[in-house]
């Protein structure tokens, strides 16, 4: 930290599209989590954008759409294409372009990928990118990102019934607090078909458990064993 006001003054970038933000976040995340395959191929980058976990909202985009987003990030110098491989591979330049340290980049990445989060959630979710000692250190870097001109993040008003305020990124432009996604609204939602399957499985397991209990009682009676004493550990 210990940033001076001068380091906050950076040329303003245009607002990113939601897919550009997702692509940028994936590039930064995978640099840390799968360094052996970084820079990323188009196929790997698209798969990262379409992940069903650790993403909010969940997307389903094509390689052509990802390429368009990459072109947009290239024009902003936020991404570039490597030249050392026969297969096109892509990498990010966010830390250099925005002039932010790796700790702040880790937090911004999680906001790009997962949407609004509390400082505690950000500390947990960013652990693979950077290990923060405590929530106070997370909040300190968030405060620095919010103090930049223009700001990169904003602290949202605490929602009714919530214990903590959430933070969200501003890379896609300003968002009114009432337009921010509801907490957990897109996180790992269970499709109706899967929910019905889980209910059916629970029902089958309950019936199987009842049959097993009946069998145990029958065998205990045949052997003259008091089942009640067994369940009490006697």
UniProtKB/Swiss-Prot annotation:
It comes from Burkholderia pseudomallei (strain K96243). HAMAP family: UPF0502. This is UPF0502 protein BPSS1373. InterPro entries: DUF480, WH-like_DNA-bd_sf, WH_DNA-bd_sf. Disulfide bonds: none annotated. Belongs to the UPF0502 family. Pfam families: DUF480 (PF04337).
């Amino acid at each position: 930290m210990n940033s001076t006001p001068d380091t906050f003054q950076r040329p303003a970038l245009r607002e990113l599209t939601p897919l550009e933000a997702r692509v940028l976040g994936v590039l930064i995340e995978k640099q840390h989590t799968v360094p052996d395959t970084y820079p990323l191929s188009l196929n790997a980058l698209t798969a990262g954008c379409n992940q069903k976990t650790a993403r909010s909202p969940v997307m389903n985009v094509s390689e052509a759409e990802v390429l368009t987003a990459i072109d947009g990030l290239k024009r902003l110098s936020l991404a570039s294409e490597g030249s050392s491989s026969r297969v096109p591979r892509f990498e990010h330049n966010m830390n250099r372009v925005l002039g932010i340290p790796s700790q702040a980049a880790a937090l911004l990445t999680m906001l790009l990928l997962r949407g609004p989060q509390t400082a505690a959630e950000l500390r947990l979710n960013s652990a693979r990118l950077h290990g923060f000692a405590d929530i106070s250190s997370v909040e300190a870097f968030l405060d620095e990102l919010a103090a930049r001109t223009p700001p990169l993040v904003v602290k949202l008003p605490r929602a009714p019934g919530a214990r903590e305020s959430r933070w969200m990124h501003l890379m896609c432009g300003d968002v009114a607090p009432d337009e921010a996604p509801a907490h957990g609204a897109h996180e790992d939602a269970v499709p109706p078909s899967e929910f019905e399957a889980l209910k059916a499985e629970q029902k089958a397991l309950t019936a199987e458990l009842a049959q097993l209990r009946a069998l145990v009682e029958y065998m205990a009676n045949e052997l003259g064993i008091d089942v009640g004493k067994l369940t009490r550990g006697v």
